[in-house]
Amino acid sequence: MINTLDRYIGKSILGAIFATLMTLVGLSAIIKFVEQFRSVGKGTYDIWQAVIFTGLTIPKDIETFFPMAALLGALIALGNLASRSELVIMQSAGFSRFKIGIAVMKTALPLVVFTMIIGEWGIPQTEQFARDTRAKALSGGSILSIKNGVWAKDGHHFVFVRRVTDDTKLDDIYIYTFDQQHNLIKLKHANQASYSEDEAKWTLRQVNHSTIMKDEIITTNHLSETWETSLTPDKLGAVSLRPTSLSISGLYHYISFLRETGQDVSRFELTFWRKIFQPVSVGVMMLLALSFIFGSLRSVTAGARIVTGICVGFLFYVVNEILGQTSVVYGIPAIFGALIPSLLFIVMIWWLLSRKRD
């Protein structure tokens, strides 16, 4: 049950988190918008489309910056309460540190639910629409992304790619060749395609050729062959969603597909488990702020708290990236690579709180 003090603490933290989040997202949006100037003028891509693209990527930024905003917002709000001795008064009135911690976590819960909702049902749609719109404008309409794949025009060829795994890997590719009278004369299908940066070319694997004659269809098969095309990884990558932009359910289904086709899933599994454990990461950030306020940051300035929060948030990011990539490289289960950073910081929180226990 939420009492008056819970609401007071929650209101203070919510306001600080919202202000911090809007600041971080706003700075990111400005940087992205400036970056788009390099593409303005290509194809039909203009300044207004750059504005739309930037706006559509804001939901992803909200999810990305939320853990940092939770840490900084909680530090600022709790720090203000501590500097006005309000936390001391609460404890004197019987509102223990544990109860204050529970009040902080109650505040985090609806925010975490909100970010998970937009991550599942908002971000994949807005990110895909943003990339599709931008790619269509930059390519002059020669690339079109649909629900089941990507269509591209390549001279007299029309290419359909079922899945763009990343910028340099494609799955289930169909290449249709037409003559000057727009008659279909060749159909090529490949299970996979990979791009070599050194040789600057695509290689198709498990290729099936169908040449359509007037009276017959001639079929041949090849294990691999070079694909001469104007479609570069940059063009195809413009319409492919990054793993971090996929929903949890989308990642789950995509991982299942990769397993069925015998492909490496470690990178996608790591992203999947990080999304699952994001509520834990947010809770850790807010409890870390609480442990600092009850400890060494009780009486310092707001600026010092912000700098400390940025440093700690960056440290968490570095530890998260190092342990995550280590799990991918050495074949450690991805669930450990996603969870261990939070567990390490929980140990740090326990140590800070126990060291400062009255």
From Swiss-Prot:
InterPro entries: LptG, LptG/LptF_permease. It is a multi-pass membrane protein. GO terms for biological process: lipopolysaccharide transport; transmembrane transport. The chain crosses the membrane at residues 13-33, 62-82, 100-120, 276-296, 306-326, 332-352. It is found in: Cell inner membrane. One of its GO terms (cellular component) is ATP-binding cassette (ABC) transporter complex. It holds the Pfam family LptF_LptG. Keywords: Cell inner membrane, Cell membrane, Membrane, Transmembrane, Transmembrane helix, Transport. The keyword Transmembrane applies. PANTHER family: LIPOPOLYSACCHARIDE EXPORT SYSTEM PERMEASE PROTEIN LPTG, SLR0882 PROTEIN-RELATED. Belongs to the LptF/LptG family. Part of the ABC transporter complex LptBFG involved in the translocation of lipopolysaccharide (LPS) from the inner membrane to the outer membrane. NCBIfam families: LptG_lptG. Component of the lipopolysaccharide transport and assembly complex. The LptBFG transporter is composed of two ATP-binding proteins (LptB) and two transmembrane proteins (LptF and LptG). This is Lipopolysaccharide export system permease protein LptG. It comes from Haemophilus influenzae (strain ATCC 51907 / DSM 11121 / KW20 / Rd). The lineage of its organism: Bacteria, Pseudomonadati, Pseudomonadota, Gammaproteobacteria, Pasteurellales.
